Amino acid sequence: RMSRGLGDVYKRQIYFIFRKEVVQMDALVEGLMEELNCETVFTIPLFGGIPVYESVVVTWIIMAVVFLLCILLSRNLSVENPSRRQVVVETAIKGLNDFFTETVGEKGKAYIPYLSAIAIYIGIANLIGLLGFKPPTKDMNVTATLALMSIVLIEVAGIRARGTKGWLKSFAEPMPIILPINILEVFIKPLSLCMRLFGNVLGSFVIMELLKMVVPAVLPAVFSCYFDIFDGLIQAYVFVFLTGLFIKEATE
């Protein structure tokens, strides 16, 4: 009887532990679905109603902030007596220009403004979660659009540098036998850019939730700081760096 009673106690303990784990996993799945779900903020009453999602509104906010900063930072510029603000801005712009020049090469300099704009947007989009907004990069539509824009620009850069015939001929280089692989690569590049950015941003949420389950205090706050700041900036760097390398490959 005593051994049977101990067995029942162990069974109940295992049952409660298992039930607790199931509840926690259900909460994780529910939180993940909330992160994937993009809410409709309002609807434009045209063509039967055009929904405007949260990621679009946050993108508009980012665009407005960047636009206002550009106006404020470009006021009262002077060649002879530059202010500290002007020196800081010029140093930052020169740094971006030098970095992207090394990445895309001399032939790809015309695409540096695009790469700079994308880097600034993705960086701010990944950091905007610190202000309570949902980062637009958690919406796969946003990351897919960024990837498609970049790939279209890469192919256009290749056509401009080599001409239409040279661009078509490049698919059969270095050997005609790898033509299918080169064609497939055109579709693989945007997919890899999209999934890398989306997966890393979403993966940070999953890791944070798992850490909260295991160590509910202190440690999650430290990792939250890392994922919200450093990982977001790293993903912006990786996206534009790969895009720059693809442009260099297409133009040389």
What are these regions (language model features)?
Residues I14-E252:
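Selective transmembrane helix interface/packing segments
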Residues R1-Q13:
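Single conserved hydrophobic/aromatic residue that forms the stacking wall/gate
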